[in-house]
Amino acid sequence: MRPLSEKVAGIAPSATIEISNRAKKMQREGIDVISLSIGEPDFDTPKHITNACIDALNRGETHYAPSNGIPELLSAISDKITKENKFPCTPGQVIVTCGAKDAIYEGMEAVINPGDEVLLLTPAWVSYEPCVQMAGGKIVKHAVNQNTFQLDDSILERVNARTKMIVINSPSNPSGAVFDKKSMKLVADLCQDFDLYAMSDEIYEKMVYGKEHISLAGIGDMAERTITINGFSKAYAMTGWRLGYAVAPAAIIKEMSKVQQHSVSQATTFAMWGAVEALNGDQRCVEEMRAEFDRRRKFVISELNLMGYKTAPADGAFYAFVKVAGDDMAIATKWLEEGHVAATPGSAFYAPGWIRLSYATSMDRLKEALQRIKRVGGN
C-alpha cells in the first residue's frame, strides 16, 4: 500500500495523554496509581451550568447552529472580554470552537504559511508545536529565565525575516508562572516593532493567586494583531464539554471560520447553552474552585520545598513545576513504577530536568502522592 502522510507521521503523540494512558492501564490492572499527570479539574461542572444544558436539550436545541457559535454565546463572550480583559470586542470578533485546542489549531491555519516561523516561549504546552507543523510552519523555541520564568531582551535574538507569530501562555502550563507587566510589554513591543502576530493562550486566567492576569490584547493596539485563546474547561470544570473560543480581528476570525466549516462544522449546540449560563450566571463557583486550588497549591509547594526540591513560581494554573537532579524521564518513570505516582516529565515541555505535577486532585490524594515521592526520591 502507498505510504501514509509524512506530515502527520512527523508529529509526536501527546506526552501528557501518553503518561495518563499508561497510568490508567496500571489502574485497570489493580494498581493504586495516583495520577498527577493530567490538566483537568477534579470538580464536577456546577449544577446551574449542567441544568442550562439539560433545559436546552429539553426544548429541542439539538439542531445545527451557526458555525461560529450561537448569537447568545458570541454576545456573552464579547461582553466578558470587553469588561474583564479590558479590550473592545464585538460578536463578529469571536468564534466558538470544539475546545481551546481547536481554536489554537484553527488560528495557526488562518495565519501561518509554509515556511513561516513561530516563536514559542518554553517551557510550553505540548500541542502548540504540532498545530504549527500541521499548518506548515516551523517552531523556534526561546527559554524564559529559569529562575523568574519571565522574559528578557534576549528574545530579540530569535526574531528574523521569517518570524510570523509569537505564542505566549500566561498563566503557564506547565510552569504555573504568570507573566508580569514588564514581560507582557516586551512581547507587545516585539510584535509591533517586527510586525508579528501573537497568540495569547489565556485558558488559566481564572486560576491566579496573588498576581494580576494581563491580557496581551489589552496592551496598546495589540488587539489588532492578537488571537486570544480561552475556553470553559479550566475555569468552569467543563473539560468533557469541548468548548473553547478565540477572539481576534474579524479578518482572522473569517479565515478560522473557513477551517471550522470544513472540519468540525461547529461546537455542539446544546453545550453552547451551558456555556452561556457559565458566563452569565453565578460566578461564585469559579472563586470557590480557585480558592481550593490555592489551598492545595500552598500545601504542595511547601511540602516539595521541605523535601529539598526547587519549584517554579506557582502563581497560576494548577501545576507545580519541580526541578529534579538527573534525567526527568527516568525519575518520572521511577515515581510511576516504584511510587505509583504519575507525573509528566519536563522534557515533554522542552524543559529537561523538570517534572510537572498537577494538584487538581483531592488533598488526601495529594498528601499520599507526596509521601510516595518522598519515599522513592529523585532530588
What are these regions (language model features)?
Residues 2-4, 12-14, 19-22, 26-33, ...:
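PLP-dependent class I/II
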Residues 8:
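Substrate/cofactor-recognition hotspot
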Residues 32-39, 56-60:
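Glycine-/proline-rich flexible loop or hinge segments
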Residues 38-41, 67:
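Acidic/polar N-terminal loop/beta-strand segments that form early-domain functional surfaces
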Residues 45-64, 78, 83:
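Glycine-rich phosphate-binding segment of PLP-dependent enzymes
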Residues 52, 56, 72, 76-80, ...:
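Generic beta-strand or strand-like secondary-structure segments
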Residues 64-97:
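Conserved N-terminal alpha-helix of the aminotransferase class I/II PLP-enzyme fold
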